[in-house]
Amino acid sequence: MQYKKPLVVSALAATSLAAYAPKDPWSTLTPSATYKGGITDYSSSFGIAIEAVATSASSVASSKAKRAASQIGDGQVQAATTTAAVSKKSTAAAVSQITDGQVQAAKSTAAAASQISDGQVQAAKSTAAAVSQITDGQVQAAKSTAAAASQISDGQVQATTSTKAAASQITDGQIQASKTTSGASQVSDGQVQATAEVKDANDPVDVVSCNNNSTLSMSLSKGILTDRKGRIGSIVANRQFQFDGPPPQAGAIYAAGWSITPEGNLALGDQDTFYQCLSGDFYNLYDKHIGSQCHEVYLQAIDLIDC
């Protein structure tokens, strides 16, 4: 896949905090290719859950419950690592976001990614849970459960490592998430069959997860992702997926070109696979393979409901 060269940005030091002004609008920081059949506008907010590419190919496309990713205060997205979450849309755990905007995911449950306050996104490994976001905007995911990602306050997205859950968002903006799988049925002649699923082209999201304050909750409009604090979902200089700004942080590679595929996964340009890379107890999410602790995943879009 061919991408446009990232636009050059200039740093301004008018105050003790660095700011930057792109030479062109940051919304032009987009891949050159687009995903066939992808939708760039979605009518409601949604979370994401981490699903391993290897297991996704063999899983049944039936209704299931997942946890959403969480977000911490920095904007990171994170996901949990070991537990699986709970419903005719199937349910998943959402990723969480911490305050910095990162997205993270947990190690062993499939949970949704969370976002911490700095905007990073993190996610967990094996349960299906929603990603969470911490305050810095990062997105992280847990190791083993499929849960939704969470976001911490910095905007990172993180996900846990062992359960499949939806992501959540913490105060720094990070996104965290865990993961899940679906089962097959057996008919009387002994054959094992997977249920066929028909998706609505206008609404390919067929999984739901419980929403909470740390769950990464995103909006998609004209190919631009924003979290509940209005920060921009971007691929930053180190290839990590997190939420910052607006505008995105200096050196951001992509800040637009997002879509939801006909299969219900988040895509950037014509790419619908990402990488969760282990960082302590959480995975950070990237658009490229950056090391031996990285695994290819899908970021499954999930509708968020009050539980």
Swiss-Prot record:
The record marks 67-68 as: Cleavage. The record marks 76, 102, 120, 138, 156, 174, 191 as: Covalent attachment to cell wall glycan. Keywords: Cell wall, Cell wall biogenesis/degradation, Cleavage on pair of basic residues, Glycoprotein, Repeat, Secreted, Signal. Covalently linked to beta-1,3-glucan of the inner cell wall layer via an alkali-sensitive ester linkage between the gamma-carboxyl group of glutamic acids, arising from specific glutamines within the PIR1/2/3 repeats, and hydroxyl groups of glucoses of beta-1,3-glucan chains. O-glycosylated. Extensively O-mannosylated. PIR1/2/3 repeats lie at residues 66-84, 92-109, 110-127, 128-145, 146-163, 164-181, 182-199. It is found in: Secreted, Cell wall. Its main location: secreted. Residues 19-67 form a propeptide. It holds the Pfam family PIR. GO terms for biological process: fungal-type cell wall organization. The PIR1/2/3 repeats are required for the covalent linkage to the cell wall. Their number varies among different strains of S.cerevisiae. Component of the outer cell wall layer. Required for stability of the cell wall and for optimal growth. Required for resistance against several antifungal and cell wall-perturbing agents. This is Cell wall mannoprotein PIR3. It comes from Saccharomyces cerevisiae (strain RM11-1a) (Baker's yeast). The lineage of its organism: Eukaryota, Fungi, Dikarya, Ascomycota, Saccharomycotina.
